[in-house]
Amino acid sequence: MDFVKLSEQRFTAKKFDVNKKIPRDDVEKLKTILQLSPSSVNSQPWVFLWGTSDNSKKRVRPAIADFNWNRIDTCSDFVVIAVRKGLDDKFQHTLLDQEIKDGRIANEEIAKECFESRKFFIDLRERSGQTLNWETKQAYIAMTALLYGAASLGIDSTPIEVFDENKMDKLLNLDNYGVHSVLVVTLGYDAEDDHNRTRPKSRLEQSKIFFDLDKFPG
């Protein structure tokens, strides 16, 4: 499907059909989309915690704001997106090893340059105290890929930002794994009585958001 058309048609599901489940083949495609998401300096700071069962939904529900409970309760699948609490040298070497394995790096000299270059950018964030902020931005990139990837497969989704991150971390014992939850996405097929399905999409006109820099006042 043309991406503009996909962007026009995609909407946020407000209610899912609890009886419709995402085929496992499509779940694997969604996981691949997340795996392939772009990130600054290929940092890949994320961890994706995938839930499908009623038990997994009950486990995260206490951290979700009550007005979003319905989206957790009725969805087919959901993903808690977490980011690492810092990207230490060990993890950076894990990234480098994978890049070598995948054929992105031809020799040791290039490998050294790649490691030092990425470490430079990561250390910049560390020194400024912006690591979590920066990693969260990467998580949003992955989430966006998931939302549109799901839409391309005919799967509806709801991004959830309003939840108690610290409570979610405790519920899932994320501190033990050195990661912090930042986003939740619910996935499934919208219910027939989902009012958002038929509402017209509303966005500001392009004239209000795009400006020609050659004519933009300095």
Model-derived segments and their meaning:
Residues 1-218:
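Acidic, surface-exposed loops and disordered segments
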